[in-house]
Amino acid sequence: MPPPRGKFSKDRKTKRNQQSLLFKRKRFCRFTVTGVKEIDYKDLDVLRDFVGENGKITPARLTGTRAFFQRQLTTAIKRARFLALLPYSDQHKV
């Protein structure tokens, strides 16, 4: 009988463990460290750091932002988009 392929293969688990060991780093909330109370939609330099190249909001699991600040961040980005301070997609140039 040939070895299992696809999602039941054992090679996938070992490969995933090797990758996670290479890129493991401690994530921290930028807003907690700097002592920010509220995230402002007019602070475009900060907001651009949390928007990807394609215009999507970067998730908290990648940035390490706490849930409290992630909610504020998404509303601030959406407000900035509505006021045309930030683009909705990567097709628009700033």
Curated annotation (Swiss-Prot):
Annotated GO MF terms: small ribosomal subunit rRNA binding; structural constituent of ribosome
Instruction: Provide the species name.
Output: Leptothrix cholodnii (strain ATCC 51168 / LMG 8142 / SP-6) (Leptothrix discophora (strain SP-6))
| Keyword check for Magnesium | no
Instruction: Identify one Pfam family in the record.
Output: Ribosomal_S18
UniProt keyword annotation of RNA-binding present: yes
In terms of SUPFAM superfamilies, this protein maps to: Ribosomal protein S18
Where on the tree of life does the source sit, at the highest rank?
Answer: Bacteria
Can you name this protein? Small ribosomal subunit protein bS18
Q: Which GO terms describe its biological process?
A: translation
Entry's HAMAP family? Ribosomal_bS18
- Keyword field: Ribonucleoprotein, Ribosomal protein, RNA-binding, rRNA-binding
Q: Which gene encodes it?
A: rpsR
A GO cellular component annotation here is: cytosolic small ribosomal subunit
Binding partners and assembly: Part of the 30S ribosomal subunit. Forms a tight heterodimer with protein bS6.
Which NCBIfam families does the UniProt record give? S18
> Any idea what job this protein has?
Binds as a heterodimer with protein bS6 to the central domain of the 16S rRNA, where it helps stabilize the platform of the 30S subunit.
Q: Which family does it belong to?
A: Belongs to the bacterial ribosomal protein bS18 family.
